Amino acid sequence: MSMHDPISDMLTRIRNAQRVTKASVAMPSSKLKVAIAAVLKDEGYIEDFAVTGEEKKPVLDIQLKYYAGRPVIERIERVSRPGLRIYKGSNDIPRVMNGLGVAIVSTSKGVMTDRKARAAGIGGELLCIVA
């Protein structure tokens, strides 16, 4: 079976694993998924991540983060999807929960947070929001 939206699959796996308080979650790896995981780690939403497995089929393993028994990620949603891509300029990138959350943006300079994209003055595809 082919996967039509690997980013949505990644976010769903994280959401489902946190609902049952799993320590980690594994998924097929790609460069974009690793970049998103790096942003989540930099922002403190996950403990760590690692790419394991053989070269033909790498596996992304994400260590989930909890605080007082509750998941750190309260909400994680896909915004731009294959059927409806959402592109925003640097001035139009939304602030998630008035700055408490983060929007992950794919720009020409790589995958970054909404704050970094606004500071750099570049827009891009709005991949997902995390709060």
Swiss-Prot record:
Record's keyword terms, sorted: Ribonucleoprotein, Ribosomal protein, RNA-binding, rRNA-binding
InterPro entries, per database record: Ribosomal_uS8, Ribosomal_uS8_CS, Ribosomal_uS8_sf
Superkingdom to which the source organism belongs: Bacteria
BP GO terms, sorted: translation
Family: Belongs to the universal ribosomal protein uS8 family.
Pfam families, per database record: Ribosomal_S8
Name of the protein this chain belongs to: Small ribosomal subunit protein uS8
Name of the encoding gene: rpsH
Subunit structure: Part of the 30S ribosomal subunit. Contacts proteins S5 and S12.
Molecular function in Gene Ontology: rRNA binding; structural constituent of ribosome
UniProt keyword Ribosomal protein, yes or no: yes
Alphabetical list of PROSITE patterns matching this protein: RIBOSOMAL_S8 (PS00053)
Record function comment: One of the primary rRNA binding proteins, it binds directly to 16S rRNA central domain where it helps coordinate assembly of the platform of the 30S subunit.
